[in-house]
Amino acid sequence: SAVVHDENERFNTVARCSLKELTLCFGLLEERHKLLVREAGLGHIGDFKIRTNINRRLMSFLMYHIDPVTMNLDLGDGTKIIQINADAIHKLFALPFGENSPPRPSDSIHDDALMRLKAELGYARNKQIETKDLRRLLANLVKDPANDALALKVFGLVLYNKFICPGYTTRVSREAAMVEDFDILKLKDFNLCQLVVDELRKAVLNWQASKSDW
């Protein structure tokens, strides 16, 4: 298990993981889009009750008390253990628990996939894409059925960026590779639950190894 340092040192005013952002984007979708999201096994996103992010002191405590090897969360004296695994994630969030491996985030925050995505979405190569940019774009795309595929791709980007595998920055970066050839209906066959566990393990390792927030 990790050595616990001073949690008060570990604050960050920016939320990388945000269910609120995801539910806001789900709310922008028209019913025709939501039907496909439901068919993909993600329709319950609109029913999430969480509208704010976790208390940052609590988040820091939890990240220090997860063993990245076993992915056990020790909440006390060694007897209050929660095992974080794909089954637990499925029960908590009801994410697709399919047999196929989902695409993974890129190792680089600046790669060709990101450049192609920026071009497809109409952004300059030097533009840093934030979730607020995606919300504005999505609000316009959903108005025209001809843009439905791109609208769902933008929603998938927010799904990965703000929920499934939030990375080291708030801007879109590593997730660009995950939405190439994006098909919303393929999500139901992916094991997104294991992806959440794997990405959380990486986050825990980075958190515990760093003296400042990543």
Where are these regions (language model features)?
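N-terminal leader regions that mediate targeting or early regulatory function
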Residues: 1-149
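Long, internal protein-protein interaction and assembly surfaces
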Residues: 34, 49, 87, 98-99, ...
